[in-house]
Amino acid sequence: MHFHFSKMHGLGNDFMVVDCITQNVYFSQELIRRLADRHTGVGFDQLLVVEAPYDPETDFHYRIFNADGSEVEQCGNGARCFARFVRMKGLTNKYSISVSTKKGKMILDVEEDDQITVNMGVPEFEPNKIPFRAKQKEKTYIMRVGEKTLFCGAVSMGNPHVVTVVDDVDSAEVETLGPLLESHERFPERVNAGFMQVVNREQIRLRVYERGAGETQACGSGACGAVAVGILQGLLDENVTVSLPGGDLHIHWQGPGKPLYMTGPATHVFDGQLSC
């Protein structure tokens, strides 16, 4: 099997992007793991696959695979790279691109300054739709994680997120608490774990331990989830800058029942071809 690919990143959250419309490529879980290896493969946090639309009302279908080969529902940084890729490769000349995902639909708007705004949909706080095991919906949940008791928010941005507020994100126990939260029994489909430091009502600092990938330089849906939880808990205003290790994202959300918008860059690194 021979195919072409692009290496891209959104604030350091890096991707291998493959056009599966003009190429016939099949990715097994084993192959994805081999390609994701940073020593012996291409190296990436996620594989993004561009497919022909499943829904006639959309332009493309967008699939996301983590480095461990598991398929996931959403990736915000990947969505921005997806938008740049399909235009760069001549698959569309639209500036507003509609895509379907495993969990729903998204609109990707390419701005004149090469920033890309993604309509991430309406944040979902109902526990059974995240999914999260809880008796009822709350703004804050008490969770026992290892030897610690954490106060967390839970939300779905198309994929599940748990968010805990910390005093200093640099000293947050991401390496130890991240894996424990990711596989916590209250999240039956595992979860992305965000550690949020509130700088002021318009800025947060954030680190994210991603389900199936570990800590990444940036997580778009994690930034969205953190802001949604922060606004719900009364900590943040509707326009927030999220400072991640890889750079800044801008999030706008007017509150429950409204769609959330994420704006940020998408960077093309190189093109390549592989025979597997």
UniProtKB/Swiss-Prot annotation:
The active site is at residues 75, 219. GO terms for cellular component: cytosol. Coiled coil: none annotated. Keywords: Amino-acid biosynthesis, Cytoplasm, Isomerase, Lysine biosynthesis. Substrate binds at residues 13, 46, 66, 76-77, 159, 192, 210-211, 220-221. Pathway: Amino-acid biosynthesis; L-lysine biosynthesis via DAP pathway; DL-2,6-diaminopimelate from LL-2,6-diaminopimelate: step 1/1. It is found in: Cytoplasm. One of its GO terms (molecular function) is diaminopimelate epimerase activity. Its main location: cytoplasm. It comes from the Bacteria. The keyword S-adenosyl-L-methionine does not apply. One of its GO terms (biological process) is lysine biosynthetic process via diaminopimelate. It catalyses: (2S,6S)-2,6-diaminopimelate = meso-2,6-diaminopimelate. PROSITE patterns: DAP_EPIMERASE. The keyword Isomerase applies. Belongs to the diaminopimelate epimerase family. Catalyzes the stereoinversion of LL-2,6-diaminopimelate (L,L-DAP) to meso-diaminopimelate (meso-DAP), a precursor of L-lysine and an essential component of the bacterial peptidoglycan. This is Diaminopimelate epimerase. It comes from Vibrio vulnificus (strain YJ016). The gene is dapF.
